[in-house]
């Protein structure tokens, strides 16, 4: 399944409680659409976040986020390029 990248920008910076609340709302919406969380990166200043999901396409992820009322900057498909390649 392809990787989908979700970008966020937080102003003011996101708190741990806010990130947890987003995940609680989002998880059921992702599961119902066959979207699997892979990993997440949060900037040290807590103003940016990138999440990686396995999903059929970007529209499925966007729909899940909108259903959960979780804002995002953009969603785009990606492929992994690693040092092992």
Please report, for each region that a protein language model flagged, where it lies by residue.
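Short S/T/G/P-rich N-terminal loop/turn motif that feeds into the first structured element of a domain
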Residues: 1-32, 36-38, 43-47, 80-85
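Short alpha-helix boundary/capping motifs
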Residues: 20, 54-55
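An amphipathic, aromatic/His-enriched active-site/gating alpha helix that lines ligand/cofactor pockets
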Residues: 55-81
């Amino acid at each position: 399944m392809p990787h989908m990248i979700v970008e966020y920008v937080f102003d003011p910076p996101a708190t741990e409680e806010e990130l947890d609340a987003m995940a609680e709302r989002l998880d059921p919406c992702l599961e119902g659409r066959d979207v699997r969380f892979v990993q997440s990166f949060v900037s040290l200043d807590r103003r940016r976040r990138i999440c990686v999901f396995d999903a059929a396409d970007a529209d499925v992820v966007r729909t899940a986020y909108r259903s959960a009322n979780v804002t995002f900057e953009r969603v785009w498909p990606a492929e992994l390029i690693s040092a092992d390649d």
